């Protein structure tokens, strides 16, 4: 990440946009990270740790989504849907619901096909309706949110 990997920021942005679309307040959602393995430290907070903390603090019900996954896989089905469910319930939670990825939903496939078609056809930046000023404003706002979350300037 310190070398410029945008993954963390992309996760934060996606989660924020989903939460806004759902009308959630900041205290109603969080971003956590999965798939720790090996000796290297991974992005935090870790999903299993956060879920256990929430359950111990009295949170009884959670819905868990992984918007970074276009389709479910071993990580989402085994680690997130099953193992993290066990962690949450063992720590005192009562209801854990994993919301599956979009997988082969027709609207999802159509959106992916449209996105790929636009990018395969050339530079989307030169397409009609492209607004460079709006993109610049969004990048500035994204940077301000990242700094507020503790990113280095």
Describe each region flagged by the PLM.
Residues 1-153:
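Extended amphipathic ligand-handling, pore-lining, and cofactor/metal-binding catalytic surfaces
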């Amino acid at each position: 990440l310190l070398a410029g990997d945008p993954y963390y920021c992309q996760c934060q942005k996606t989660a924020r946009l989903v939460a806004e679309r759902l009308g959630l307040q900041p205290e109603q959602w969080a971003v956590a990270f999965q798939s720790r393995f090996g000796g290297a430290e991974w992005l935090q907070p870790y999903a299993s740790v956060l879920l256990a903390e929430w359950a111990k603090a009295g949170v009884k019900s959670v819905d868990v989504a992984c918007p970074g996954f276009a389709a479910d896989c071993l990580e989402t089905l085994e680690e997130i849907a099953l193992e993290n469910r066990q962690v949450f319930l063992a720590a005192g939670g009562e209801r854990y619901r994993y919301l599956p990825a979009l997988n082969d939903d027709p609207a999802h496939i159509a959106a992916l096909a449209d996105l790929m078609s636009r990018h395969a056809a050339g530079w989307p930046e030169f397409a009609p309706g492209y607004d460079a000023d709006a993109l610049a404003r969004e990048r500035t706002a994204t940077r301000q949110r990242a700094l507020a979350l503790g990113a280095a300037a």
